[in-house]
Every structure is written in structure tokens, then in C-alpha cells.
Amino acid sequence: MLFSHYCLDKPGAEGVRLENRDNHLEFVASYGDAVKIAGPVLSDDGEKMAGSILIVEHESLDAAKAWGELDPYARAGLFESVDIRPWKWIIGNPEDAS
């Protein structure tokens, strides 16, 4: 099942994000095809990274939450909020080539 991970950074935490970025990218990449979409949320002016959106395949909501807690960004205390929910891919899903 797919889950969306919508994470917003704490205000003023750009340094934490940059310090942990390489480890975060390595962590996400290590899950291979289970990660369907991933990228930063941007500030209103589009100039700074302000959070993360990931769509990831997990066995359950509990597994999604556990995976999210292992993210180096989460472990470093970057996020002000994290919202993880089941997600259904309707438009543009490459696995639904009907």
C-alpha cells in the first residue's frame, strides 16, 4: 500500500536540513522502488527547502511510521510536523498503464 509522508521543517532549521541532507538522500535511495516520489517542499517564494513529501510503499501504517522515524532528518529533529496517510495514485501512475 502507498503512503504519503508530508513533513514540514521547524522554522529556522535550514542548517539541520543541510547537515543531514546527504544521509537523508542515501536513506531514501536505499529503499529503491518502494519510494515512488520524493522531493522537498519549498518556501512560499520557492527559494528554500521547507519540508519533504514522499510517496512510499509500506506494508502498513505502523510500518510507514517506523520507516519515517528512521529518516536521518527525523532523527536530527528537523521536522515540526509529520503527517503520514494511506495514499492512492490515480493520475500518472506508471504501474496502471491501462
Question: Could you tell me what each predicted segment is?
Answer:
Residues 1-98:
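Conserved, structured core segments of small domains
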